[in-house]
């Protein structure tokens, strides 16, 4: 920890590829002084003497050699991202240029930043809580509008505020019980269990709402695990190609062309899909194809969504019956493909369960795809997600901490129901308090903090 506050770190904050602009960032007590050793302005002015939140035009130099023409941004702590003195050098974005400037800063007293160290310093300096720090990583990694908005909501402190509210209530009642136990002559806890239960139930209800958001949260962050199922030659690979907008899967008239799982990522109306094209479901003596069929069933069992493609130009058979049995009770959409041909299967077919939406499509003619997209969006997010009041837990670590806190409050209610001594309430209340603190980082261990930030990119 001592090294953290006594050292000045430097890293490249932009992508390591040739581009118009590159940014090299420094943070720490010597940031301005190190910058002065390599910066030369037109008026020979020292950066150390300049005001915070100002931008200065000049050159980065190594002795008499000019390295690049730059704009240098100054931010004095605590009014910076890290809470420390920060310098951002905006240079030309050539890979060699930014690396050369970074090497020059290190030569003049900075040390290379560890992965995620800027955000880690922001957390340790109180600029962000841990849920907000994790939101920074999620924001950078977001692949769709929902993931972006969820990360922004968390970065604004929505989770922090909700968790802090719960912790304050728990701490208040824990403190009251502890005080009463220490001074029973002046403070009575007779009948307090009933009062406490109302508060605990209220907090648990708020926790349950957060826990109920976890499935949607995972889908927002990671995408919908989607499996395309159907018999051979039903048009599964054609559908994948249409959704991707490119010929990714091989399409032929030969049954059994797809023998393994082909996985791709795509966005449909703001929703990320991790979509898998699988081998056609049928009885087969071919050993390799049979492995593919078994794997298709295995993936379907773990899927968030199944797109069951039926060749509607042919009657249903025993293989369709097997697939319908396979998807029973799951989240699925039935797609009647080849609607441009004489249809032998219709939406009204009695074999098709009413629990599933049924859509007529033609992968060949790109018909019905928009209806599929709308149905998918409605199926997962009731047509729209809002981030004004709703909070979505997208982080497994946060979910686990919430579950631990919820279990602790369940124990409090059990103790109240069993009329246990009040000190039992206090123990479990503190367990809940500390579990919630793991979400915001107020009660988390240093090793876990290091592990979390090690997953960040170098310049963040």
Where are these regions (language model features)?
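C-terminal-of-GTPase-core extension/linker across diverse P-loop GTPases
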Residues: 3-12, 16, 145-267, 284-286, ...
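Short glycine-/polar-rich loops that comprise or flank the Walker A/P-loop
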Residues: 19-21, 53-55, 302-306, 329-332, ...
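Generic enzyme active-site microenvironment
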Residues: 275, 309, 335
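Short glycine-/small-residue-rich Rossmann-like dinucleotide-binding loops
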Residues: 244, 279-280, 304, 311, ...
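Inter-motif core of Ras-like GTPase G domains
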Residues: 289-313
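Switch I (G2) and immediately adjacent beta-strands of P-loop GTPase domains
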Residues: 56-68, 72-76, 256-284, 302-305
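Conserved beta-strand segments of alpha/beta enzyme cores
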Residues: 111, 272-274, 357
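A glycine-rich (often HGG/GG-containing) alpha/beta subdomain
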Residues: 1-149, 153, 157, 333
